[in-house]
């Protein structure tokens, strides 16, 4: 099963046990805790430990058909909030306090030190009461879609929830956070002409990306009080199954949460001049995070936003400013296609926020890992750059503007039949806590040590199994 590519090996570390007896669709890793939630065809969500890969709890009773997608709400302290999307046309929101009981601590391998801490604090709570507190609470059911809900995503700030459906619509809901689990519908977007398969929020801004059966990717933003489409990305020749954002990049070389910038690999062992690296970071910072998409057409494409040009000098107009339209449209270009490695539809792509690696999988049961590297080849001009008027290019030369060093993507690992004869529906990167370090700290109140955590890849298959992989290089 391991890969045979020269760049690295994808090693099967473990399965999450016990597996589901029905098809599993997607797994979502918690933003703070070493746990992951898996969506199942049996109408349930299974929550597993990423410390010892065992089942912690099963969330059920809220949906009447398969749970197709789920997402953890970010920036929530003291509790975990999970949104679930179902084929029954509804979206559920579940809540649970992060105070895990002793039974779960045993499963996580955390019982020793924590049990002693409880005794020192005088914790003599009855076990039955503790078990009751551990239950997930079904907070609210969001109803509005006319057909199967395919994907759900929280905004980076956690106040907005996006859902999409087979009914060709995208709904944006606002969590009022009033203590009564009230949500308000703020937008219903219906520009797609086919099933909407996926929604994903920008990692820093309130900008939403969607992929559809109509072969397009669309970007949405709020303008004043109305949400609307700001870009339509065309290029795929089949259903767009998944879109994912790159981690933010800053000139300082830090992505905002203490993790290093996901720079491309330098194949010449550091010979790339620091000024060239800085130029690459500056250009990426101006463009913002890129998008990766995968499709029925068996391609994976990287998309980049073109920075907006400086506004022209102010010209007085007889038209009042209150009725002059403000342009919020964005221009996106297809930057490249990743090496062709899949024989059938590609269902899922995942862009690591820690390493910058991209993982893909699909109907052929293959998992592929790609990395970006700097290349000595001159930058390839995109069609839109070639179409620039001569005056614009002359202006660039006059201003001494330089093009950032070019990059290319290469395959570093590939595994065939990752789930034997079954299709693989989803892959995602996850943070795995070190079990020995976790035993030394109070799991209830601590976040994972981001500097020392290990990143693993989770694959979710039609066989009901979620597999854990590590990349060895």
Swiss-Prot record:
Sequence ranges of Acidic residues compositional bias: 123-133
GO CC terms of this entry: cytosolic [4Fe-4S] assembly targeting complex
Pfam families registered for this protein in UniProt: WD40
UniProt keyword annotation of Repeat present: yes
Gene3D superfamilies named among the record's database cross-references: YVTN repeat-like/Quinoprotein amine dehydrogenase
UniProt biased composition (Basic and acidic residues): 384-400
InterPro entries: CIAO1/Cia1, G-protein_beta_WD-40_rep, WD40/YVTN_repeat-like_dom_sf, WD40_repeat_dom_sf, WD40_rpt
Source organism superkingdom: Eukaryota
Region (Disordered): 1-25, 112-133, 377-405
Keyword set includes Repeat: yes
UniProt keyword list: Repeat, WD repeat
Start-end of each WD repeat: 11-58, 62-104, 144-183, 191-230, 235-313, 341-380, 438-473
GO annotation, biological process: iron-sulfur cluster assembly
Family in the record: Belongs to the WD repeat CIA1 family.
PANTHER family linked: CYTOSOLIC IRON-SULFUR PROTEIN ASSEMBLY PROTEIN CIAO1-RELATED, WD40 PROTEIN CIAO1
Reported function: Essential component of the cytosolic iron-sulfur (Fe/S) protein assembly machinery. Required for the maturation of extramitochondrial Fe/S proteins.
HAMAP family: ciao1
UniProt protein name: Probable cytosolic iron-sulfur protein assembly protein 1
Gene for this chain: CIA1
């Amino acid at each position: 099963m391991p890969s045979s590519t020269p760049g690295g090996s994808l090693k099967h570390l473990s399965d999450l046990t016990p597996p589901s007896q029905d098809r599993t669709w997607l797994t979502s890793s918690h933003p703070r805790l070493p746990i992951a939630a898996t969506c199942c065809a049996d109408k349930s969500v299974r929550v597993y430990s990423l410390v010892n890969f065992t089942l912690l709890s099963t969330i059920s009773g809220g949906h009447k058909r398969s749970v197709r997608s789920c997402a953890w709400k970010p920036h929530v302290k003291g509790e975990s909030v999970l949104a679930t999307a179902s084929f029954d046309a509804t979206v559920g929101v579940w809540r649970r306090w992060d105070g895990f009981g002793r039974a779960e601590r045993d499963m996580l391998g955390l019982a020793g030190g924590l049990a002693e801490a409880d005794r020192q604090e005088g914790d003599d709570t009855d076990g039955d009461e503790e078990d009751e507190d551990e239950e997930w609470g079904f907070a609210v059911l969001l109803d509005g879609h006319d057909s199967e809900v395919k994907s759900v995503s929280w905004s980076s700030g956690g106040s907005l929830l996006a859902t999409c459906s087979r009914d060709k619509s995208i709904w944006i809901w606002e969590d009022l956070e009033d203590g009564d689990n009230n949500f308000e519908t703020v937008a219903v977007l219906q520009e797609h002409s086919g099933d909407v398969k996926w929604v994903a929020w920008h990692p820093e801004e309130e900008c939403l990306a969607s992929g559809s059966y109509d072969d397009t990717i669309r970007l949405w933003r709020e303008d004043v009080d109305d949400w609307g489409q700001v870009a339509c990305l065309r290029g795929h020749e089949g259903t767009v199954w998944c879109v994912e954002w790159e981690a933010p990049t800053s000139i300082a070389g830090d992505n905002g949460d203490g993790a290093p910038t996901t720079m491309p690999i330098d194949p010449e062992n550091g010979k790339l001049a620091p000024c060239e690296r800085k130029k690459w970071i500056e250009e990426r910072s101006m463009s913002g995070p890129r998008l990766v998409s995968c499709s029925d057409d068996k391609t994976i494409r990287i998309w980049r936003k073109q920075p907006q040009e400086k506004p022209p000098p102010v010209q007085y107009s007889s038209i009042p400013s209150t009725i002059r339209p403000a342009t919020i449209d964005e221009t996106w270009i297809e930057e490249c296609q990743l090496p062709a490695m899949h024989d059938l539809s590609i269902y899922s792509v995942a862009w690591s926020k820690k390493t910058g690696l991209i993982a893909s999988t699909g109907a052929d049961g293959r998992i592929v890992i790609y990395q970006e590297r700097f290349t000595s080849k001159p930058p390839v001009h995109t069609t839109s750059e070639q179409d620039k008027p001569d005056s614009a290019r002359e202006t660039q030369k006059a201003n001494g503007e330089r093009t950032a060093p070019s990059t290319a993507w290469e395959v570093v690992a590939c595994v065939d039949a990752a789930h034997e004869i079954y299709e693989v529906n989803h892959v995602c990167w996850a943070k795995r806590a070190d079990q020995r370090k976790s035993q030394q700290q109070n799991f209830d109140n601590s976040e994972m040590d981001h500097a020392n955590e290990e990143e693993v890849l989770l694959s979710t298959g039609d066989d009901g199994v979620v597999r854990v992989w590590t990349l060895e290089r």
